[in-house]
Amino acid sequence: MIPQLCALAALPLTAILLASCGTDDGPMLAGNTQAASAEGEALYQKAKQADESGKTGRAIKLYGETATRFPFAPSADEARFRQAQLLEQDGRIEDAFEAYDQFLARYPGSSQYLTVLNRQASMAQSAAEGDVKSSFLGLKTKLSLEKTVAMLEKVASHAPRSRTASKAQFTIGELYQAKRNKTKEAIAAFRKLVAEQPDSPEAPEALFRVGLIYMEEAERGNQNQANLDLA
């Protein structure tokens, strides 16, 4: 046994390393990475051609495939960005929001990060404004309350303790406040804003909203008691 161990120890380090790379579980070699990048760029060019030809559906598919299969390709971030834009233009709001979200999660160092974040925030705020107006008018909304809140939470998570996050958190409180049966959630949302960003421009109004909700709840309680007394 000892002679065998000695013989193994005498093998050159390069031979051992080469042997260890013989399985499929090893890291991707530089040549493979370059080949994948080249393939990704070729796919991106096909997506651009479809885009320029007005074949929106095909362009969306190819842009998404480029960014998903070849995330390290030079144009992968641009592919995801353009996919999101086309989805938004096509009216597929939830899909567009998700594509923007994938961009923000994958390419935080991109020069277009702030542009994408602002676009995503605008989409979430627009969805929320429609939800609030519909709640007061008694209409049904296209997106559920849960989905709209989730959109705003994602926006806030990409820019914690920023003005964008403050606006998003305040809007979450407004959404819940517009629902008569969501007062606890509204209070919690407004309080979270005040606790995490007490110096934000939205904090004073959030604190005021908490007091207002408590007053409205007390008035409703008194009215209910009065109705019981009259019964």
Regions found by a protein language model. Give the residues of each.
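Acidic, polar-rich low-complexity tracts and alpha-helical solenoid repeat scaffolds
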Residues: L18-A231
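Bacterial N-terminal signal peptides
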Residues: L8-L17
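Bacterial N-terminal signal peptides that target proteins for export
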Residues: M1-A9
